[in-house]
């Protein structure tokens, strides 16, 4: 699944946080 590219959006999404590395304001 594609996670939000904006870090704050990723941080609000626990599923995304479990799957993504969020750095420098972006999710990758």
UniProtKB/Swiss-Prot annotation:
Keywords: Disulfide bond, Knottin, Protease inhibitor, Secreted, Serine protease inhibitor
CDD domains with a match to the protein in the record: PlantTI (cd00150)
Cystine pairs: 3-20, 10-22, 16-27
Similarity section: Belongs to the protease inhibitor I7 (squash-type serine protease inhibitor) family.
Site positions per UniProt: Reactive bond: 5-6
InterPro entries per UniProt: Prot_inh_squash, Proteinase_amylase_inhib_sf
Subcellular location(s) per record: Secreted
Family annotation (SUPFAM superfamilies): Plant inhibitors of proteinases and amylases
Pfam families: Squash (PF00299)
Protein name as it appears in the record: Trypsin inhibitor 2
Domain note: The presence of a 'disulfide through disulfide knot' structurally defines this protein as a knottin.
Function: Inhibits trypsin.
One GO MF term attached to the UniProt entry: serine-type endopeptidase inhibitor activity
Any coiled-coil regions, as ranges: none
Main localization of the protein described in the UniProt heading: secreted
A GO cellular component entry from the record: extracellular region
């Amino acid at each position: 699944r594609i996670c939000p590219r904006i870090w704050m959006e990723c941080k609000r999404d626990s599923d995304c946080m479990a799957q993504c590395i969020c750095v420098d304001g972006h999710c990758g």
